[in-house]
């Protein structure tokens, strides 16, 4: 269809004057010759277009009524995006005592990144310190701490077909813009109300420049990872280690849009969502470690110990809709507020042991076992024992006659290992959602409860993952070629999956 209209997206007459598809042959006759240049009515010059939004007496109507608009390709995409930049700075300080018993390190890093999309940027500051001290009383102390602060902002981004039917996407609206529309030369704001305005007759696509100026998603993350350990050496063969680890994570989120946009309720009425996600992980670890030569041919290394892990997650925030005064991004400036809240916790206790046995440096056997208990499963199903074993044999280390110029190294290995996977949250109990309406009228507030569409499984068990592997490693042709071949089979018992359910059951999964 070569007929022009401000309803179109990516078609229309050619930009050349002549030819079958030239604008001089526009079937509708809308493109006219103005002093040798093809022109059309300015997209904001139609009184019917502007009257639909503001009534006849408005600034844009007065400015563009009767104005002509040159029919030519504009560099809208090229001019919308900008050149990105990245600045990265790092400083490292380290030192140690003359005897090596005391050492430390300090690192600082800064990243400042400006994206190629307007309104997009990332900044990160990172500080880490660490140290180690070997004391005269057989104790060794070491620790490390890393703190990072990351801030990120971006205009709306989502899956889109350009006209916004799938989601509010700045990219989609930019690439959907026809070549003959001067994106960067057209006003994007209606002066009377700050709303979005764009070229289409129905003003049914958000102007990308309005999105950049009026809507944003942002996130600031503060995170601390810290580890400290204390080791006591009873003698040269056996030691005891305690280690504590902390992972603290705080995520502050803010999404908003001013009102008077188009196409989406969030843009039309305005919204503000702010919420925090907080994660705390505390981990305690203690182990007894040993290493002995049982004979001239047999060596043994072992460790036994226990772990304790506690993980908590908390979300809290407010979602507000219905902006009252344009430009004021505060929760008190919205008609409706909905609280956001969620909490979960999981404790995991474990005991473990392992032994490594070697015979004449050519036969190696490893045995491992662990048992874990978790707090968010019923007592009859909250424990899992999972052992592992592996063996490796090096013929080339056992007998030099196996070696040659064409085979310098050969290792044959086999192993069977198991591990456990525990579900998070509270999958064995049904949950109830609670919503409040503080504006309940004369009868006061209304509290509504709803049952989750997820059906809990009180008989849920942890997953047991098992893997059997056989392999060969070799180096041939004077060590020029390395060969690694493996066969493995992996199985999962009591696999946890989300199963769709018919809605007639009252649940969906």
Predicted regions mapped to residue ranges:
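Pocket-edge structural micro-motifs
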Residues: 95, 178, 185
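Low-complexity intrinsically disordered tracts that form flexible linkers/tails across taxa
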Residues: 152-178
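Residues embedded in well-ordered regular secondary structure
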Residues: 1-118, 156-159, 189-197, 207-217, ...
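Extracellular/periplasmic, surface-exposed regions of secreted and cell-surface proteins
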Residues: 124, 130-139, 144-149, 158, ...
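N-terminal, polar/charged subdomain of small-to-medium soluble alpha/beta proteins
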Residues: 263-264
